[in-house]
């Protein structure tokens, strides 16, 4: 825009003062000019000075209201370059504008999305970039609205980042994902821009290339901050979560890292960016998040924008002059002539000022009217778009109906063809064929109607599209005419000001330069003629503009009718609001009355609540008394068993007694806590009732097991144990009686139960059987020796099974070979599983020793935990012995010298032995140990392999045994009866033998558990079982003393004879 650099003082003295309204008008004018110059259809980058004025305007008015008021009227749908530069300005204003700009953008998100969708459906290079850029802007707006701690410029300190991320790992995880999405949108825009540009570096020096590259400056600024924040958040996530969980995050970060590094490298090589921005360099490789110290090596990338040289500002017009209406044309011509030769009197200056003011007011009026017309036209276009969308939806529905009609028509035609094929069947099908033909004709008629309707909708749609295009063209022509008028006004203003300056100079030198003025008369006359021609052209364009203005005024009248209709609807709505207000006042009166009633009901409820509270206290006390009475009955029953002669046959081990006494002693603490809570709040007795119930059961169990343990103990310890149990029962009954009395309940002392329970615990410890006769310093060596011997026994068993496999292949064939291979393969799998279990148990044992010995040596640790060590030795011996027995039984079965049942029993014994080894290893293992998890998995595998051995043995036994059918031919009734009686006799004999064997098995198990409980030496009848002395070094089976078990009941006779077998548990 042209402006006057040297303004005379007299003109400046006549300028009006800057009121608020004038300042606002000047601000709007400056913003409109900057927006129109920044966002245009020229393929050139946005000038920084125009964008800077728009950004300063947002800070001036603390928002972007003025910007959007002008930007919403831009014809963005007519030019993809215009839309691209519009997105660029949006990005700059969002980054550097006032913070309130973000909320103004939120209201126009739908407009931004519509622009992107519009150009996304068109095959245009800039249109594709506009679609991607709008997605980036929408993502940026959503992110900053959701996280207000991050400004639109993305520049925050590490403290603010830590505060925004918080301490919740879920929030950190989600924030990282959102930043990844943000970075993806930025990188996608940069990749799309580079994809459209030529690879030559010189492209960046062309205006078309610079137009595409200019927005990437903001992308570089955003990406540098996002990269730094994602690195920080990734390190924080790796400090809270395992590495496997974040594998997807690391892969996504590495992909973005390489894309960002490539983007920065390509941008650094372009000359266009070298003078505008200093791009940081990223490291050669991505950070190693698995190493926490790598965070100290991370360097924050910093983008530097060099200070620009101050651009020469385009001066603004100090005096704005518009074209005058047609009636004032002679006045303008006369003014130009008078400015050249001077006015005849001094009053013309005032007339010229008035004329300028009138022209300015008229131009402002026309401008306001034009803005209103443009807004109305935009609204009309929006309505047309809505109608087009509705018609398109209706057209789609008609297409669906047409498709459905075609399908129905095809089905009916198919039915008609079938009916025609069946025409020879008789007159019975004649009616059906006619009905099908009628349906087909009706369907065809409906199809033709739908086709006509479809054609009509297509024509309507095309007509609406033409109208929409005509309206857009009309608006474009109107805007071009307005710009032409503005240019003409600027030319006239410049010429008038130039003439005015020359006239003033002539007036000052008129006395001595009159002749010179006469010579210039002809030149001024020519200029006047040219000005008249320009004025006539302006008049013609003004007449055309006035005709278009009349058309728009007609549309304005129509819209005014719509406004009046809306005002009538508004009045009706206001009357409805008044009615609602009256109803609301009545409702408030009624609610005040109800409020008074509710207050009375509230007082009544409070009194009822007080009664219910007292009832609750009584009920809680009743529950406590009931629980105390039940506990008293349980304890009384336990105390009565101390003198019960029927209880003399019951026995228990000291180890079990110690475990029960310790549990009862631990329950005393819970009882004390529950008693304290009940005294603090009598409304809740649940804790005291639960603790009392647990204590009564555990105390009664301790008393009963103490008496049962005394039956196997020597006389003096047994008497002391019985006396202590009686004392414990008496104190427990006294405590329960105190809890039933409300007056004595606060003075009850549950801690008095600790002394008798500790006495029982100490006596149980004294009654435990002594350890094996092994020096404690030899235990560590014995453990390693026995584990090695077990591994060697298993390896030997595997080799023997392989030898048996090869021997069976040479000596057997057919079904026997198949059975033998199946049994030996299952035994081989079992041996491999046992070997893996022994290796895992050895690893777990070493882990236990290393974690538990502290500063002590390995031998000292084994000596300190001698019983656990003895358990490991016993378990390893059992596993080795079981493997040896399994191989021997399998050898006998293959050679047809043994029984299949021996192999089944050996499989069960191996499963029990491995369970014993697992139990011995789990005693001191950490529950979170990976070796313990693998040991348990190996134990389950051993059980599965043992079950496979049993299954293969049983199936092989059934396959080999002959199952001949009985031949009843030739037998008379007498012979059949005789054989039946003989079979019954045989069954009775076998049942008696089975019963005797079960009794013998029960006796053997009873003796076995007695010997295991006392750690005794096996009898001479079992030469294959070694002495428990560890110096023997034999791999025979040790006594199984680790698993508590009760002998099974065979029949009633066995119950009467032996009673209940005691449970023995050896603690390691």
UniProtKB/Swiss-Prot annotation:
Sample GO molecular function, one term: phosphatidylinositol-3,4,5-trisphosphate binding
Compartments reported by the entry: Cytoplasm, Perinuclear region; Endomembrane system; Cytoplasmic vesicle, Clathrin-coated vesicle membrane
Region of interest (Important for actin binding), ranges: 867-924
Source organism: Mus musculus
Protein name, entry field: Huntingtin-interacting protein 1-related protein
Role: Component of clathrin-coated pits and vesicles, that may link the endocytic machinery to the actin cytoskeleton. Binds 3-phosphoinositides (via ENTH domain). May act through the ENTH domain to promote cell survival by stabilizing receptor tyrosine kinases following ligand-induced endocytosis.
Modified residues (N-acetylmethionine): 1
Keyword ATP-binding belongs to the record: no
Main location: cytoplasm
């Amino acid at each position: 825009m042209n402006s006057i650099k040297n303004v005379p003082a007299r003109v400046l003295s006549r300028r009006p003062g800057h009121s608020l309204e004038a300042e606002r008008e000047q601000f709007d004018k400056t913003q409109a000019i900057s927006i129109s110059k920044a966002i245009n259809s020229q393929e050139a980058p946005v000038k920084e000075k125009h964008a800077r004025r728009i950004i300063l305007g947002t800070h001036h008015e603390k928002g972007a209201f003025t910007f959007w008021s002008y930007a919403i009227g831009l014809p963005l749908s007519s030019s993809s370059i215009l839309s691209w530069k519009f997105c660029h300005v949006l990005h700059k204003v969002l980054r550097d504008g006032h913070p309130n700009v973000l909320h103004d953008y939120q209201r126009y998100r739908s407009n931004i999305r519509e622009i992107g969708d519009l150009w996304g459906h068109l095959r245009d290079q800039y249109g594709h970039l506009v679609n991607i850029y709008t997605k980036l802007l929408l993502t940026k707006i959503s992110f900053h609205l959701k996280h207000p701690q991050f400004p639109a410029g993305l520049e925050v300190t590490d403290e603010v980042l830590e505060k925004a991320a918080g301490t919740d790992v879920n929030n950190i995880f989600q924030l990282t994902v959102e930043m990844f999405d943000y970075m993806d949108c930025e990188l996608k825009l940069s990749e799309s821009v580079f994809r459209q540009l030529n690879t030559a570096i010189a492209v960046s020096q062309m205006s078309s290339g610079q137009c595409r590259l200019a927005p990437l400056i903001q992308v570089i600024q955003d990406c540098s901050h996002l990269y730094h924040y994602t690195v920080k958040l990734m390190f924080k996530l790796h400090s809270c979560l395992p590495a496997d969980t974040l594998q997807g995050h690391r892969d996504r970060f590495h992909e973005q890292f390489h894309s960002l590094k490539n983007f920065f490298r390509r941008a650094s090589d372009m000359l266009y960016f070298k003078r505008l921005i200093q791009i940081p360099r990223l490291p050669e490789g991505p950070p190693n998040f698995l190493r926490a110290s790598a965070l100290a090596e991370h360097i924050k990338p910093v983008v530097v924008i060099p200070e620009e040289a101050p651009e020469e500002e385009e001066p603004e017009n100090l005096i704005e002059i518009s074209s005058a209406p047609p009636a004032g044309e002679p006045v303008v011509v006369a003014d130009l002539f008078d400015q050249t030769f001077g006015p005849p009197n001094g009053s013309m200056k005032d007339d010229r000022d008035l004329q300028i003011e009138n022209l300015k007011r008229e131009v402002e009026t026309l401008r306001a009217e034009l803005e209103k017309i443009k807004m109305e036209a935009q609204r009309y276009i929006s309505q047309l778009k809505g109608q087009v969308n509705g018609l398109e939806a209706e057209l789609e529905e008609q297409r669906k109906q047409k498709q459905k009609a075609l399908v129905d028509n095809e089905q009916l035609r198919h039915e008609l063809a079938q009916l025609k094929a069946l025409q020879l069947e008789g007159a019975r099908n004649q009616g059906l064929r006619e009905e099908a033909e009628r349906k087909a004709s009706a369907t065809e008629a409906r199809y033709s109607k739908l086709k006509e309707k479809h054609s009509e909708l297509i024509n309507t749609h095309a007509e609406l599209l033409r109208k929409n295009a005509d309206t857009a063209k009309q608006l474009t022509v109107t805007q071009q005419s307005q710009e032409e008028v503005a240019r003409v006004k600027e030319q006239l203003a410049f010429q008038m000001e130039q003439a005015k300056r020359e006239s003033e100079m002539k007036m000052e030198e008129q006395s001595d330069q009159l002749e010179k003025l006469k010579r210039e008369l002809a030149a001024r006359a020519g200029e006047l003629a040219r000005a008249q021609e320009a004025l006539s052209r302006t008049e013609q364009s003004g007449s055309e503009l006035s005709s278009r203005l009349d058309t728009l005024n007609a549309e304005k009248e129509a819209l005014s009718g719509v406004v009046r209709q809306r005002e009538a609807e508004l009045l009706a709505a206001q009357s409805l609001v008044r009615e609602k207000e009256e109803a609301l006042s009545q409702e408030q009166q009624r609610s005040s009355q109800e409020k008074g009633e509710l207050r009375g009901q509230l007082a009544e409820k409070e009194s009822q609540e007080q009664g219910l509270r007292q009832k609750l206290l009584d009920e809680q006390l009743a529950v406590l008394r009931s629980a105390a009475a039940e506990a008293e009955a349980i304890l009384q029953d336990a105390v009565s068993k101390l003198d019960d002669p029927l209880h003399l046959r019951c026995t228990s081990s000291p180890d079990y007694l110690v475990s029960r006494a310790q549990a009862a002693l631990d329950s005393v603490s819970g009882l004390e806590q529950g008693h304290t809570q009940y005294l603090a709040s009598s409304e809740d007795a649940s804790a005291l009732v639960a603790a009392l119930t647990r204590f009564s059961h555990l105390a009664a169990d301790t008393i009963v097991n103490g008496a049962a343990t005394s039956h196997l103990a020597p006389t003096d310890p047994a008497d002391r144990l019985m006396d202590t149990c009686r004392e414990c029962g008496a104190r427990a009954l006294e405590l329960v009686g105190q809890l039933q009395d409300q007056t004595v309940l606060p003075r009850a002392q549950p801690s008095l139960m600790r002394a008798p329970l500790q006495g029982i615990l100490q006596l149980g410890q004294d009654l435990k059987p002594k350890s094996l006769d092994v020096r404690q310093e030899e235990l560590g060596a014995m453990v390693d020796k026995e584990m090695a011997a077990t591994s060697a026994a298993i390896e030997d068993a595997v080799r023997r099974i392989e030898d048996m496999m090869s021997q069976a292949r040479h000596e057997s064939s057919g079904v026997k070979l198949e059975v033998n291979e199946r049994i030996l393969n299952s035994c081989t799998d079992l041996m491999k599983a046992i070997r893996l279990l022994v290796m895992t148990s050895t690893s777990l044992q070493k882990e236990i020793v290393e974690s538990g010995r502290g500063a002590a040596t390995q031998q000292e640790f084994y000596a300190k935990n001698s019983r656990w060590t003895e358990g490991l030795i016993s378990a390893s011996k059992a596993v080795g012995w079981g493997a040896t027995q399994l191989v021997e039984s399998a050898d006998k079965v293959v050679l047809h010298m043994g029984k299949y049942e021996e192999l089944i029993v050996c499989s069960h014994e191996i499963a029990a032995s491995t369970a014993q080894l697992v139990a011995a290893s789990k005693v001191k293992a950490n529950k979170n140990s990976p070796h313990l998890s693998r040991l348990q998995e190996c134990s389950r595998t051993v059980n599965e392999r043992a079950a496979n051995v049993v299954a293969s043995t049983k199936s092989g036994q059934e396959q080999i045994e002959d199952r001949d059918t009985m031949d009843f031919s030739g037998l008379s009734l007498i012979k059949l009866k005789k054989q039946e009686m003989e079979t019954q006799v045989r069954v009775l004999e076998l049942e008696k033998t089975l019963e005797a064997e079960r009794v013998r098995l029960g006796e053997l198990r009873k003796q076995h558990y007695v010997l295991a409980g006392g750690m005794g030496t096996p009898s001479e009848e079992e030469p294959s079982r070694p002495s428990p002395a560890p110096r023997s070094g034999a791999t025979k089976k040790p006594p199984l003393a680790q698993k508590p078990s009760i002998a099974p009941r065979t029949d009633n006779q066995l119950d009467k004879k032996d009673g209940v077998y005691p449970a023995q548990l050896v603690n390691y």
